[in-house]
Amino acid sequence: MYSVCDVVRDAVAQSHLCACPNDKLPQCKGVTKAPPECSVFHLAKLQDTKFKWKYTLDPLKAQKLDQINKDIEKDAITLKLIYGTELSPEDVEWWKMQRCLINKNTGAKGGQFAHKYLERQDLELLGYSPTSLIGGDLMFTALPDKVLRTIPVVWDRFLNPAMMIFFLIILLCIILGIFYVLVRNTLRRKQKSKQHQMEIKRFIKEKEQDPYIHTSFESWPADPNKEWKELIPVYEAQGYCMADYRKKLGMPPVPNC
């Protein structure tokens, strides 16, 4: 029984003839039509087209999807006639094909692919031309192949690689910003705690150095009302009656009221 990857490997072996008949291509000389195995790639294209129309607001959406489903059914029948088994059209998609081995031993059954797995550039040679829901095909060619190779094509339906990397950079900046704020706040708290501990130690040290400690001449704390007591004569000089305040603060009365 044939698996999807078996079908893909067979199709890759014939992929150099999928553009035939075309007199401009040397390999198409004498070829009157493309091999039926090429239906795999046509079916994968239809699956991408179906996905795009599925999420569009175009008034012709229903009509277009109906036609696409008919075309998908034709390709599925073609593959069934070749391999004698009915493959689910949902299994024949670019992102699933990417995971298939071209050749289990050499990695290049068709002779034109050098990688063990089908990479993004390989799929493009087979007809893969994505248009994402977000970003479309914007800046697809702006990214080097080394970068594109690291991004699975499964994301292409939703967000193109250039936009994805842009969003990842923004996300990374946000994460680094949050990390910076957390570290800064933590360091500030530690610094304040350290200063507080130093003030306590300094206070204890100063108190221990008091020559009159534990004697009848031990220093007493400053009067908490000292500032108010100093301000009262100032207000009295301006003509205010401060008798009640003098009484509350334990100051001697003055006949100024």
UniProtKB/Swiss-Prot annotation:
Places the protein is found: Host membrane; Virion
Bilayer-crossing regions: 123-143, 163-183
Major localization class: host cell
Induction summary: Expressed in the late phase of the viral replicative cycle.
Keyword Transmembrane helix attached: yes
Membrane topology according to the record: Multi-pass membrane protein
Domain of life: Viruses
A GO cellular component annotation in the UniProt record: virion component
UniProt keyword terms in alphabetical order: Host membrane, Late protein, Membrane, Transmembrane, Transmembrane helix, Virion
Family: Belongs to the asfivirus C257R family.
Entry protein name: Transmembrane protein C257L
UniProt source species: African swine fever virus (isolate Tick/Malawi/Lil 20-1/1983) (ASFV)
